[in-house]
Amino acid sequence: MERIYSYIAAITVCLLLGVSCGKDNPPEPQQQHTAAVEELILLMEANPTVKSLLEKSISQAAAVNPDRRYNPAQSLYEFYEFVDWNIRQLPWEVMITASPTQYGQSLYGRTDQGVGYFWFIVDQPLDELRDRGYYYPTVEFVEPFSSWLTTYASSWGEWLSTAESWNSSYYSIVASDPDWGLSNGWYEDASNWHSFNDFFSRKLSSPSARPIADASVVAPADSWPKELWRIGEDNQLVFPSDLQIKTAKLSDIGALIGEGSAYREAFAGGTLTHTFLDVNDYHRYHAPVSGTLRELRNIPGVAAGGGYTMWDDESKLYYYSNDMGFQMIETRSCAIIETEEFGLVAMMPVGMSQICSCNWLPSLKVADHIEKGKEMGYFLFGGSDIVMIFQKGVEVTLLHDGDHLLMGQAYAKLGKS
């Protein structure tokens, strides 16, 4: 706790005096830093080019948002200090100052901003990285910093799974906020939650909390459903002409399905859709269709933001822009389900932002028959995405209007084309 109070005090003094808290010579990694930051310091000292890119990203972020109330990490040393602070906080406590807007003051808004600020720092587009094949020309995709982001995400996730991350007052905060749905009678008894991640991956009280619709495809999770994307005969996503994505790996369905799968080419000419889970959603995922489980895999990827983060000075909020394609590089899982009438369906939970944990239930086994709506796994803290892919010859008609769906509600009708 001493480091936390020191961080608050230091930032407060800087704000009062209107000066930078930066230091020209950050200390050697010792006990004053967390293990994650010690690792980062060593990586930066061993890789001066990447260190320079990170420093430029931090500086560029400070030029975009110089307001220290909302952007306290404006030097490399301050970035180290911020990460030390960040990975020992609940998501809604990460940002000391909240936006004055109604959204920014809400628990959901503070959580959203607590997740997004880190990515704003490392999401800055850098000229040196343009046209070099990165998803975005940002330092978050440059090694070894890119790999360290997994350390950062894992370190925060580990703390969020400790008893220190949960108590009765934290429960009261979320229980009193309707955005989290705890007053609806949907979930298991709160006495089962002994950490923030226990709460975040909470179970339903009974199957009746999420009735399963009589539709070909149901929502695999509480989520915001998106549109359909066509897959070409070359197994590449077909992008609208106004969507500029230049690297082939961001459209390759085989790459999305992952190395080592027997089904990398099975969806050429088919259709893809995806649905986004927000941070306050129920974060367990269920089978969208009935059928036989033919493959069950985990696919390692990067711990990236799932898009890029920008700053709106008027509202004092960070906001996100994500194009289809980020799923190709994120940590994800893949289940191949063979249906009786409509061939193979791929269901792919995708970790986003500080989420790098997609977890299948241990009871799932290849060759099992699974019923539509059966629980299959869960995410730990953050926002996330679920991709569903259908084969050539299957006509997919969406049954939603883009509004939020609960798991089990009608998502799509399937037919033969």
Residues covered by each model-derived region:
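Contiguous, well-folded functional domains in the mature portion of proteins
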Residues: 29-417
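Bacterial N-terminal signal peptides
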Residues: 9-18
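Bacterial N-terminal signal peptides that target proteins for export
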Residues: 1-9
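Bacterial Sec-dependent N-terminal signal peptides
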Residues: 2-3, 18-34
